[in-house]
């Protein structure tokens, strides 16, 4: 399901126009950028984390930790930056976007299980969000 979602999601946002508007709105400090970041975190990344927890047999009803959210942002941002490199910087990228997404998903899911697999409920040093 994540592969299908990210294929469809990137089909919508991977245009030079969309990426330029998004990036410029962030540089200008416009509310639309902050709103969209909130939507991505609340509607996409939180659900991705819930699915990861479910797959790992962990409780999925708890709010994501700061560390989980950061790892999900790193994953999501890597896919996003592929579009920036291709459509804004016009840099060479792997032409098979679906393969890039599949590889990113494999790395993220394996990494999630390695980092959080059985440690979500164990006490950890608090992670403080900055900004």
For each feature predicted by the language model, list its residue ranges.
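Short histidine/acidic/glycine/proline-rich micro-motifs that form metal-
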Residues: 27
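A conserved short alpha-helical segment within the catalytic HATPase_c
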Residues: 6-7, 105, 109, 113
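Conserved catalytic core of Hanks-type protein kinase domains
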Residues: 12-13, 78, 111
């Amino acid at each position: 399901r994540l592969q299908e979602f990210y294929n469809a999601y990137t089909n919508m946002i991977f245009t030079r126009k969309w990426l330029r508007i998004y990036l410029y709105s962030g540089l200008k400090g416009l509310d639309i950028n902050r709103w969209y970041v909130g939507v991505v975190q609340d509607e996409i990344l939180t659900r991705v984390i819930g699915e990861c927890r479910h797959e790992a047999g962990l409780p999925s009803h708890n709010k994501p930790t700061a560390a989980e959210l950061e790892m999900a942002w790193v994953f999501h941002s890597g896919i996003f930056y592929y579009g920036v490199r291709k459509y804004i910087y016009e840099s060479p990228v792997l032409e098979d976007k679906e393969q890039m997404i599949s590889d990113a998903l494999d790395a993220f899911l394996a990494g999630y299980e390695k980092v959080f697999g059985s440690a979500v409920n164990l006490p950890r040093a608090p992670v403080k969000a900055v900004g």
